[in-house]
Design a protein with these regions (language model features):
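Enriched for short, Lys/Arg-rich terminal
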Residues: 2-4, 82-124
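Basic, Lys/Arg-enriched alpha-helical interface segments
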Residues: 1-85
């Protein structure tokens, strides 16, 4: 992704996060959150695309949010971004590291239905 200043940004996902997304597709389909496997794939793809696009934008605008100390077990100097679909009760949180001001590595992802979400402070 290229920002308005011409700088290239790169967002990558750790192997653990990639595995989580593949498992999420199966879970969403098996638990009948989606009636068709392709719908579950599309939903997960939407989450991935959102974070690939928005994480660099947030950083460029100086709106990156520092992750709470609890999440530092997943990496040093973590930031996080949130995604919520319109009319959805689920918010996804991606925790990421920043390298060289233009590389972003998503190292952990959760949603508001997990126990870990209790550690997210919303006024940061």
């Amino acid at each position: 992704m290229k920002n308005t200043l011409g700088k290239n940004y790169h967002v990558v996902f750790s192997e653990d996060v990639k595995s989580f997304f593949f498992e999420l597709i199966d879970i969403l389909f098996q638990k009948e959150y989606f009636g068709f496997l392709d719908e579950a794939k599309e939903y997960v793809s939407e989450i991935v695309q959102y974070f690939e696009t928005e994480i660099p934008k947030l950083h460029q605008l100086g709106l990156s949010k520092k992750a709470m100390p609890y999440f530092q077990k997943y990496g040093e100097n973590l930031f996080f971004a949130a995604y919520r679909r319109t009319k959805s009760r689920t918010t996804w949180y991606a925790f990421y590291e920043i390298f060289d001001e233009r590389y972003f590595k998503v190292v952990h992802i959760i949603n508001n239905h997990t126990e870990e979400s209790a550690y997210i402070v919303h006024n940061t």
